[in-house]
Amino acid sequence: RSQEAVQSVQSLKTWKQAVERSDTRLTVVFGTKGGRPRETVILDTIAVRKALDNALAIAESCHGRLIDKPDLKSAMDYWHNQAARIGLTGAYSPHSLRYAWAQDAISHYLAQGFNRKEALAIVAMDLGHGDGRGRYVAQVYGQI
């Protein structure tokens, strides 16, 4: 979610510590839908570590922010404009990338030995939906 990305700077150090401890999940607190914290699985530790290192370096050079704007609204506007400017539209929009992540997560859980219903329920929770939303996740994200 875009708001999670923009506000994630508040959790970068915590996430870095989690990765260094070899945790398999990260807790997303800021910018979540309805303000409900959620946990999400780390599918690629190396990629997550690299993204965190890059984000921490950016925050250090931008007054502790990932987007150096005076308020959330202007930061969100900047985020959306920059995403479109670099081609994150259509099949590559941030929400489309969420779909792709969900499909990768479903495959990950299936490979871990979970059955399809379990995998969908876990992905529903990873996405910030309740565990009872597995059927919704199957309909929206689960076309694999």
Locate predicted features.
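Conserved tyrosine-mediated DNA breakage-rejoining catalytic core shared by Y-recombinases
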Residues: Q3, Q7-A51
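Catalytic phosphate/metal-binding cores of nucleic-acid and nucleotide-processing enzymes, i.e., regions
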Residues: Q10, S74, L120, A124
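Hydrophobic/aromatic-lined pockets within catalytic cores
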Residues: R1, Q10-K13, I106, L110, ...
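Short helix-terminating capping/connector loops at secondary-structure junctions
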Residues: E20-S22, E60-S61, F114-E118
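C-terminal catalytic core of tyrosine-transesterase DNA break-rejoin enzymes
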Residues: R98-G130
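Active-site/catalytic core of tyrosine-dependent DNA strand-transfer enzymes
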Residues: L43-A105
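Catalytic-site neighborhood detector that most strongly recognizes the C-terminal catalytic loop/helix
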Residues: M125-I144
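Key DNA-contacting residues within the recognition helix of helix-turn-helix
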Residues: V6, Q103, R135-Q139
